[in-house]
UniProtKB/Swiss-Prot annotation:
Its EC number is 7.1.1.-. It catalyses: a quinone + NADH + 5 H(+)(in) = a quinol + NAD(+) + 4 H(+)(out). It comes from the Bacteria. InterPro entries: NAD(P)H_OxRDtase_bac/plastid, NADH_UbQ/plastoQ_OxRdtase_su3, NDAH_ubi_oxred_su3_sf. It is an enzyme of class 7 (translocase). This is NADH-quinone oxidoreductase subunit A. HAMAP family: NDH1_NuoA (MF_01394). Belongs to the complex I subunit 3 family. Signal peptide: none annotated. It is a multi-pass membrane protein. The keyword Cell membrane applies. Keywords: Cell membrane, Membrane, NAD, Quinone, Translocase, Transmembrane, Transmembrane helix, Transport.
Length: 117
């Protein structure tokens, strides 16, 4: 049970710091709204027409695919650095990891997630 006290303390301190920062920000933020505060910031030009521009959801799909396959570098780099020490077992595990990633990429390609519509 004493092993979990550190984890619980870490979670509580994290929540307190997060909530404390949000509360402090709320309490000290400037509340006055005037003409200058509502204008376009710095060198921006005043907008003409509708300011809400809709982005295609295809951008979201590409961004999500990038994040998914970019995270693999976090695992590939340490493996490449310690490749000699890990031996054959490390090589097999990394090939399995890469196979799963390629399988996911193949599935996304098959479902049309990489096609621009």
């Amino acid at each position: 049970m004493s092993d979990w006290i550190g984890v619980a303390l870490f979670i509580v301190v994290g929540i307190v710091f997060g909530a404390g920062g949000m509360l402090t920000s709320f309490l000290i933020h400037p509340r006055s709204k005037n003409k200058f505060k509502l204008e376009t910031y710095e060198c921006g030009l005043p907008t003409e027409g509708a300011t809400w521009v809709r982005f295609k959801t295809q951008y979201f799909t590409y961004a999500l695919m990038f994040v998914i396959f970019d995270v693999e570098v976090i695992y590939l780099y340490p493996w490449a650095v310690s490749f000699v020490d890990l031996g054959l077992a490390g090589l097999i595990k990394m090939f399995l990891f890469i196979f799963i990633l390629v399988l996911g990429l193949w599935y996304a390609w098959k479902e049309g997630a990489l096609e621009w519509k």
